[in-house]
Amino acid sequence: MYKVVLIRHGESVWNKENKFTGWSDVDLSEKGNEEALKAGKQLKKDGFTFDLAYTSVLKRAIKTLWNVLNTMDLLWTPVVKDWRLNERHYGALQGLNKAETAAKYGEEQVKIWRRSYDIAPMALDENDERYPGKEARYSGLLKGEIPLAECLKDTVARVVPYWGKEVVPQIKAGKKIIIAAHGNSLRALVKYLDNISDSNIVNLNIPTAMPLVYELDENLKAVKNYYLGDPEAVKKAMETVASQGKVKK
């Protein structure tokens, strides 16, 4: 039996402001830092330890991981950063307020953009200042690898192969692994691990900075999963995520 821990980054500044973030490299809010520290304490309390960590190339996930490992006195842990664990790219929606966008386009349309499996939002133009190809961190990527917008299906197409090629061999080698990533890159992985249908994935919401433990059999198939901490707090946090795309009243 293997275990792997997944954790979404703590609340970011744009989560707090209810904005679409995607590949925009915004920082953690004060609350987000506190959430990550709390997650580290919970993991330590429950006896978890790690000897390998994975995260994206976006600071909100990197800092969440750092806070968790620091709290657990595990800062020596090797960390692999990879763009394939980035949040899904929200295209031209990045930087827009979700509630204001819902007021303009309708809550149902925003829910489709946020949670559907195969419908991407409006794409960025390559001349847009938000285009990732302008950033040094993506200089090693081919032009065709840099998204202008993504749906969850696109995110699955980069996250799941990365899991299979890079993470699975390390789990089989006995490494104790934590993956600190994003709402949609983790939804992509959870969809695969739990074999969630394209239609049902719309209802899955992952709360910020709450450790999600997967127990896997010898074939790396999910046997069970559970969040650490208070179940009511987890439920409330999921509801908060689900409500972000609604018109503000």
Swiss-Prot record:
GO biological process terms held by the UniProt record: gluconeogenesis; glycolytic process
Domain of life: Bacteria
Catalytic activity: (2R)-2-phosphoglycerate = (2R)-3-phosphoglycerate
Pathway membership: Carbohydrate degradation; glycolysis; pyruvate from D-glyceraldehyde 3-phosphate: step 3/5
EC number: 5.4.2.11
Keyword Isomerase belongs to the record: yes
Gene3D superfamilies, per the entry: Phosphoglycerate mutase-like
Protein keywords: Gluconeogenesis, Glycolysis, Isomerase
UniProt GO molecular function: phosphoglycerate mutase activity
Pfam family, one: His_Phos_1
Binding site for substrate: 8-15, 21-22, 60, 87-90, 98, 114-115, 183-184
Coiled coil: none
Site feature (Transition state stabilizer) residues: 182
Active site: 9 (tele-phosphohistidine intermediate), 87 (proton donor/acceptor)
Keyword Isomerase: yes
Family from the record: Belongs to the phosphoglycerate mutase family. BPG-dependent PGAM subfamily.
Function description: Catalyzes the interconversion of 2-phosphoglycerate and 3-phosphoglycerate.
Name of the protein: 2,3-bisphosphoglycerate-dependent phosphoglycerate mutase
Protein encoded by which gene: gpmA
